[in-house]
Every structure is written in C-alpha cells, then in structure tokens.
Amino acid sequence: MKDLKHLIYFESLLENADNELVKQAQAEGDICLGYTCYHVPEALLNIGNCFSVRLRAPKTGSIDIATYYMSNYTCEFARALVERGIEGGYQFLDAMIGVDACSMMNRAMEHFEVLKVNTKEKFFVTHMDIPFKVVDYTLDAYEIQMQKHVLDNLHEKFGIDTSDKAIRKAVKEHNEVCKILTEIGDMRKAENPVITGYEYHVLNLVSFTCPKRLILPYLKETLKEPVSYTHLRAHETSAH
C-alpha cells in the first residue's frame, strides 16, 4: 500500500498547535478561535475571516504547574491545556470558545482567564450553556447562546460579518470538508482498503486543527489519490 502524497506534511501540521497553516492564515489577517468540545458548532467559528483550531497540547511533558492550580483529580487533557497555556503556547489565539459541558474543561477555560495566559488586547474567553435535550425550547436557547456569546462578540470585537449570508457560506465550506472526509472514510470499507485507519485519523485531525480554506485543497487532492491507487492495484492483479 502506497502512503498518501501529503501524509508527512499532514503529520508535521500536528506537531504544534500553531502550525504552518495557522501562522499563514493569521499573517493574512484571519482571526484564530480556539475550542475543545464538539458541542461548539464548528461552522460558526469559521465565519467571515475567522477560523477554528481544536486545541491540543502536543509534546506535553510535565503538567505539575497545572496540577498545582487544578488538582490531580482533574483530567490530564484539561491540565495539559492549562500547562501549555501557562507556558505561552496559546498566545497565538484571538479568542477561546468554551462550553458548560465538562466541568473539568470549564475549570481549564476559567484558568485561561484568571491566569491571563493570552495577553492580546482583544482576546476573550466565552462560555456557552449547552442544552442536553433536543426540544424546541432548548434549541431556541442554544441559538440565543450562540448569538450572544459567539457571534455578537466576534462582531463587536473584530468587526466580523455575522449575517445569514456569511453563516451559510461557512456552513457550505464545513459541509464540503465533511463530505470529502466521509468519501475518503468509505474507501476503508473496501475488501482491499486503499487508506489505513491511521491515515484517516490524521486527516480528521488536520481538518480540526487547520484553517478550512487552507487545508481544503489538500483534502480535495487526497480524495483523488486512492482512486489512482485502486486502478494501479487492479492492473497489478490482472497482470498476475
């Protein structure tokens, strides 16, 4: 089985939270929004010239300082984020979008504020109350939370266009990324898969941690790759 053309590049993008594409987007004037939980509607964080980065803490060593602030009973992921934040590893963020879901992650986000891990003038941390039932009144509440805590903040602090047109554009781009990943994932169902589980995992991670507009061309190219591999394998089989 042949490795994907951009696999090494994708792996390099996962070595640091502020990877090459994040730096490129910010150099071009884009606003970087960090988040940690799937309860945050990712598409809304990619509205206008904003882009989302799902936070990780690669190359984490000791988390002793974060443990001092949070206690050793909190999960290691939450503490790793706080540790990296204290080290200055999230100075590249323009905002941190949190949700009131996991109490330990709430503690982590609170420490982002209390310890002032980011010194940018316009940096803010916001928390949203996420409903756990899907009924009409909770959906209405969810919409209000997104408007008040995300869209209004982005518009007021950074002048982001939060119109319905801008939202629909962000949703369209998000759906395109999801469609590509779904099609690539379906290739793993073949009798002789042309993509490994590891490769697919890497693709998923880069889609969460890189600006959508910059990673999308690489994902499109990757989608076409396994087709050529399939043709090559079929030719080799018939030759035998």
Where are these regions (language model features)?
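Conserved small/polar residues in nucleotide/adenosyl-binding loops
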Residues: T230-T237
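Trp/Phe/Arg-rich N-terminal binding region typifying the photolyase-homology
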Residues: M1-D164
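Extracytoplasmic substrate-binding proteins
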Residues: P131-Y229
